[in-house]
Structures are given as structure tokens and as C-alpha cells.
Amino acid sequence: VNARLAELTQKADCPFATAMVENGDYIVSKTMGAFSLVVLPKPGQDVKAVQTAMEELERAAQFGLTGTEIQRAKEEIYSAAEAAYNNRNKQQNSYYVPKYVRNFLENMPACDIETEFNLYKMLQQQLPAESFSATLKEFVASTDSNFVFLAMYPDKEGISVPTTDDFKAAVKAAKEAKLEAYVDNVKQEPLVPVLPKKGKIKKEEESLFGYKCWTLKNGARVFYRQTDFNESEVNVKAFSWGGSNKLADKDIANSKLFNMVFQSTGLGNFNATELQKKLAGKQASVNASLSAYSEGLSGSSTPKDLRTLFELIYLRFQTPANDPDAYNSLMTALRTTLANQEKVPETAFRDSIFATLYDHNARQTNLHVADLDKVNYDELRRIYSERFNAAGDFDFVFTGNFNVDTLRSYVEQYIAPLKAVKKRESITDLNIRPAKGIINNRFVRAMETPKATIARFYMGETPYSLKTAAVANALGQILTQRYLQSIREEGGLAYSVGAAASVSHDLRDEYAVQVFCPVKPAQMDSALLLMDQGINDIAEKGVTAEEIEKVVKYELKTFADNQKENAYWEGNITNYIRWNNNDVEGYEE
């Protein structure tokens, strides 16, 4: 049912931004269950949204669910359960804690993964397809005797709230509507209809951190490392210099929407809805992204779905699918979301931070409703084709549980045949720098509940080394602890305060120290004085041996834990490839 509702949202004229059903507690009650439909209407379409969502629920109850829908749902649940089962011996605390909480609060069985997986396999085989439709029909109320309707709105002037009779009429109209059975349109063709001729690996060599590197004939480089940290995980990351810095100023708005658009639209010959159905039961995804300096891909799969991962990589380097329905649906939803965000004082605060730090540079601003009027789907597709024109300009990183021979075969089949480049693009520096000098920006906005937020930034250039990076990291942690003591515990000025410090090495060697603290407006100046005092004390007197000991203990524990994380090694090899950084060797010393 949720898949049907999500499919409706891909249409630009859908009156709701999102809608979903769930079977669980009745609101906050732990002693009464309920089958619920939750609807988030688009502005001014509240009644229509309720009627449309209810009609879809009634359609499913009247005509039942199709066999292909049920099969896809089974495959989705099974593939997720299988991935958890395959990695059952390497679960972290975050997996176990919620289980025991539910066991204590709700008397839910705290089963191990193996038991859950075996139960699911048994139930999946025993439940006939018609039982799902029968259960749904029981869930959907046929009379008003067991039906509750709740509508919640902000208590603000100017908000138009439909009447109870309006909503009753919408529900009545949905129940009395003459509906037709849902048609499950499924595209049967392969993701990649015609396989390209295999390409070749030109060179093999060792790299850092246990990675090896294949240089392909088309110019692409593939770094790979086999691990057994997670039995069900293979990660991929790819990147090429270029990014939004290569775009003209007229494309700034397009660049801000790039990531969202191409994560929401289809691939190859499949629109977004068709692709979602095609990938049912597959634990594989690949997203494209555009940043200031580069464009890239990021994705993951299970070992079982590695071929699908490579098919998606291959499709990401083809002409992007023309999916105007998904694009228009996204734009409509964004107008609602951004309009609501712009009413919130915190949005103005975030905007002011960027405007202050980067002197109102248009490339360093957040997305606003006004930007949407400057975005053009055809231009976005043009930008995509330019930025992802040739895989030969990219470096790929694969980390996880895979067979090297299988990986080699897929690299030769899906990456090596892609377009080559004679010369790789170089990084483009637009000379966007933080504003210099001491700048104070204090502004006031009307708020129902008055509050203030302090954001402080200390930024500049300093030579990078592994030691300075470690020292900066320690500074942020120690500042946080000192501010918690002086501002929260002793001063009683705030519930929370946090600091972070870093030294980066990319185009320039820079440092940044940031402090955030929400306070009552009348106590803001007092908090600022304590902030100054805290950082000045460290500058003049240094830190204590006890503070250093705590940081070192925490960092060494984190470092040891990270040795078994695919994402940690992926991040470090990526940092090395892009910036020639080695933040692993010598870190403990």
C-alpha cells in the first residue's frame, strides 16, 4: 500500500507530499493497536489529499493486492533479513539495545537474528497471497463505528483549517467512489539491455592501507580492498575533479538542486517508479552527486547483488533518464518544504552564518524557494551529461566483502568500456575565502518562544600535519568540556554547548574552530564572556594533563574501533587519492 501511495506522489498533481499506512500502536497507547493512514497535504489541498489517499486505501481493500506487488514486498523483506543474517556474528550494540528496550516496555520477544530469519522463511512459505488482501480488508474500517480522524494544525493566524464536515465529506466521498482495480505496471526489460564489449585492465599495483589499484585502458583507476568487517557490505565511491566550480554563475541554482534531482529521478530506460519496482529485493543503490570541486558516485550492495551495483554504476554514466513526472513532483514538494523552512527563525540564522562567513557569495548560500524559479530540468540534464561524460576521468574505490575475480570481471564489463579521456580535468579554485577580520552579526527576529543562539567561528590558514590535526581535534573536545562546566553547570546559562576544531589539507591548509550555544536572550552577553574566557585561558595557560589523557584515551579507542569499519578505510584512501593525505600511519604516536 505504501508503494502505491509513493507512486502517486511521483505525479505533479498529487495533492499530498507524502502518505503512508502503518500497523502499530493507537497514537501513544501501548495497550491498543490501530491501522493508521498518515497524510501530509500540500498547501491548500488538505481535503483533496485526504480523499485521494483514502481512495487508494479503499481501492486496495476492495480489489486486493496484486501478486506481483506481494512478491516484491516479500523479496524486499527477505533480502534485508538475509543481509542481517549473513552478518549476524558482527552486530554492534546499536542492534541489541532497541531489542531489549522493546522487550522490557512492550514484551516483544528479543530473538536473535538466526531465529528471526528462520521464522520469516517459514512464514513466507506458509502465507498464501490471498491472505494479505484479506488482512488488509479487515484493517480498513467499513463503518464509522471504529474510525478515528485526527487533524493537527499550527495555532497561528492566517492558517486555514477545513471544518469537521469538510473532512467527513472527503472520507465519505472516498468510500463511495467508483474505483477501478490497480494495475501494476512493471517493466520487464533488463537494467542494461545490451552489454558493452569488455574493456581491459592496463596496469596493476599496490596502494596504501591494504588497497590495490587497477588502471584501466580508458584511464579510470579502480582501488579495491577485500574486508570481512561486514559480511553483507560492499561500498563504492567514485570521484572526478570538476564540480560546480566548473559551472557558470547562471547555473548556481541548478547546481544546488543537482543532488536531489538525480537521486529522485530514474535511470536508463526506467523512470523512478519503474526503477524502484525493478530493484525490489535487491540490496543495491548508487547515487550521483555534485560538490564544489568534484562530481562523484556513492553506493553500496551486498555481495549477492554486486552485479546490480555495477549495472547501476554503468547507467550513471549514460544520458540521464528523462523523468519529468518525478522532477515535477520533487519541485512541488520542495516548494512546500522550503516555504515552511523560511518561516522558521533558525533558517534565517543558518543563512546569516553563510552570508557572514563568505561575504554573501552566491555559491555559498542555502537553497530557497526563489532558487526554484531559476532551475531548469533540461539544463540540469545537460550539466549531468557534461560532468559524467567520461568514466575515464574518475577514480573508483571498492571496499568490502567481495571476490576479487568477480570484481575484476564486473570492472572489465561495466567500467572499462565506458568513455575514455585524453587528459583528466584539473581542480578549479574560484578563490572563495572566509571573510577577513573580526565580524559581529547580531540580528533579531520575532519568535513565539524567545531564544538566542550563539555561533562563533575562528578561521585562518596554518600548515597541515597529522599532529596539528590531532591537536585541533583535541582542542575542540577540551573546549566543549570546559564550556559545559562554565556555561552550563556553573553559569546555568544553557542546556547544551558544543565546540569543534579541525585543520584541513585540500586546496589550502586551514584551521577552523566553531562554537554553538543556545541561550536565553538576556544571558547571551554573559555566555559570550565565558566563551572568550575559555578559549583565552587555553591560549595563555594551555590544557591540563588530565584533559589530554581523557582525549587520548577516547581517540585511541575510536581509532581501534575504526579499524573494523569499511567507511573508515574508504574515507582514508579517498583522502589519500584526492589530497595525498595519510592520516593513518603514525596517528597513534
Model-derived regions, located:
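M16 family metallopeptidases and their MPP-like homologs
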Residues: L5-Q62, T68-Q126, S145-P154, F223-R225, ...
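Short Ser/Thr-interspersed hydrophobic loop/turn segments at strand-loop and sheet-helix junctions
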Residues: L479-Y483
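Proteolytic maturation boundary segments
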Residues: V1-N2, A6, Q71-E75, S79-E82, ...
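Peptidyl-prolyl cis-trans isomerase
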Residues: Q126-S131, T135, N322, Y327, ...
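Conserved short beta-strand edge segments in small beta-sheet-based binding/regulatory domains
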Residues: D323-S329, V421-E425, V543
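Conserved alpha/beta enzyme-core scaffolds, especially Rossmann-like or related mixed alpha/beta domains
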Residues: R387-N389
